[in-house]
Amino acid sequence: MTTLTPIHVIGGGLAGTEAAWQIAQAGVPVILTEMRPERLSPAHHSEDLAELVCSNSFGAKAGDRAAGLLQTELRQLSSLIITTADRHAVPAGGALAVDRGIFSRSLTEQVASHPLVELRRGEVTEIPREGITVLTTGPLTSPALTEDLQQFTGMEYLSFFDAASPIVVGDSINKEVAFFASRYDKGEAAYLNCPFNREQYFNFWQALCEAEQAPLKDFDRETAKFFEGCLPIEELAQRGEDTMRYGPLKPVGLFDARLGDFRDPANKEKKPYAVVQLRQEDKAGQLWNMVGFQTNLRWGEQGRVFRLIPGLENAEFVRMGVMHRNTFINSPQLLTASLHFGDRQTLFAAGQLVGTEGYAAATAGGWLAGTNAARLALGLPLLTLPATTMMGALFNFISSASPKHFQPMPPNFGILPELPQRIRNKQERYGQYRDRALADLTTWQTSIKSLATCRV
């Protein structure tokens, strides 16, 4: 029997730990390299694999919630991370939360004791040029490896700071208030526009100036010094009442065609005082990005203040605005939905490095990248998951979104294909998404011939 060459997994976070486990479970040797404790990142405190550096929660458990559906899919696929999280869960209401220390130590012991896993400690400074490799180095990738990744991908395809605007579910936008238009009617009506009158704008501006900001970590603050080109919306508001109106909220050339012709002098009083524009985020038009609204407000404050925008009174946010250091690649330009680089099929990537958000999403990426790396080593075709599953939809999104405006995305129902019939009740609709996803995942698992390789 031919001896298989070990697959290299670089980075021992959630994605890397899951990837290494899936590779080993498929019968392929794997070398998992984690730079800690030889080199600590600014956020980590231990040498354990899959250390949870922020919250101890994987999000809601219920299958009719986006994070919960992703967890359920991962359970069905025998994810090591989710199985271990279930085993070491602590009371957290409707969320899956864990005892961080026990959780990470348990994962370290399981992975290190696997006969096909070699756990190495030390910094990797460049991407291996030969063999199959899975990159899972996360948002705090070391400077040396970041530089090599830059050389491989090209500077324009690598981001170092995540300054992203909130994303809103299209169905939650009041279309009786918001209107479709492009400035001066040039091209197609590509934007949804939320118009303010003077009083509404003043109230919004005042609330924005008074809203509480989230404190930046030291390593975030250092990066933010070089990020003047993308100021947070609250910073613009602090510079004066009219600053936003002459910046991202400028109303010039925007008019609701339902009110008549904007060139008609009789309609002068109907012109908006300021306008918030939302740009389509996905091909199906279910997600909308608030243009120019990168922000460092606390999440609760964002919901309170941004719902003062006319048309967004009942807005459902699938992602809040964030500003923090976050090394991630432009996945739509570089990756396939199988999570390998288009220019090099033997190089895979997963986790926050590819632009997914959240613990469950990182785990899901590790599962797919690890499974496909093992299949490549075994001469089997690579897998993509059904687009109707949360996993499939997430990786389809990051590999096919607009490269120009790509920002990290958490799991959410807005990226799933629409249901055959429109269901107005949100809870019922999400339940239908869940049922379809799990049924399609079961069918997909059955259709895969090499069950032992895929661990499904």
Swiss-Prot record:
Instruction: Write out the transmembrane intervals.
Output: none
- Record's subcellular location: Cytoplasm
Q: Which residues make up the binding site for FAD?
A: 11-16
Could you name the domain of life of the organism this protein comes from?
Bacteria
Q: What does this protein do?
A: Catalyzes the folate-dependent formation of 5-methyl-uridine at position 54 (M-5-U54) in all tRNAs.
Task: Note the PANTHER family from the entry.
Answer: GLUCOSE INHIBITED DIVISION PROTEIN A, METHYLENETETRAHYDROFOLATE--TRNA-(URACIL-5-)-METHYLTRANSFERASE TRMFO
Q: Which UniProt keywords apply?
A: Cytoplasm, FAD, Flavoprotein, Methyltransferase, NAD, NADP, Transferase, tRNA processing
Principal cellular location given in the protein's record: cytoplasm
Single GO molecular function: tRNA (uracil(54)-C5)-methyltransferase activity, 5,10-methylenetetrahydrofolate-dependent
Primary enzyme class: transferase
Gene Ontology CC annotation, any one: cytosol
Which reaction(s) does the protein catalyse, per the Swiss-Prot or TrEMBL entry? uridine(54) in tRNA + (6R)-5,10-methylene-5,6,7,8-tetrahydrofolate + NADH + H(+) = 5-methyluridine(54) in tRNA + (6S)-5,6,7,8-tetrahydrofolate + NAD(+); uridine(54) in tRNA + (6R)-5,10-methylene-5,6,7,8-tetrahydrofolate + NADPH + H(+) = 5-methyluridine(54) in tRNA + (6S)-5,6,7,8-tetrahydrofolate + NADP(+)
Q: Which family does it belong to?
A: Belongs to the MnmG family. TrmFO subfamily.
Task: Extract the HAMAP family matched here.
Answer: TrmFO (MF_01037)
Q: Which organism is it from?
A: Synechocystis sp. (strain ATCC 27184 / PCC 6803 / Kazusa)
Pfam families for this protein: GIDA
The record's InterPro entries line, in alphabetical order, gives: FAD/NAD-bd_sf (IPR036188), MnmG-rel (IPR002218), MnmG_N (IPR040131), TrmFO (IPR004417)
Entry keyword Cytoplasm: yes
Biological process terms in GO annotation? tRNA methylation; tRNA wobble uridine modification
Q: What is its EC number?
A: 2.1.1.74
Keyword Isomerase set for record: no
**Which cofactor does the UniProt annotation name?**
FAD
Q: What is this protein called?
A: Methylenetetrahydrofolate--tRNA-(uracil-5-)-methyltransferase TrmFO
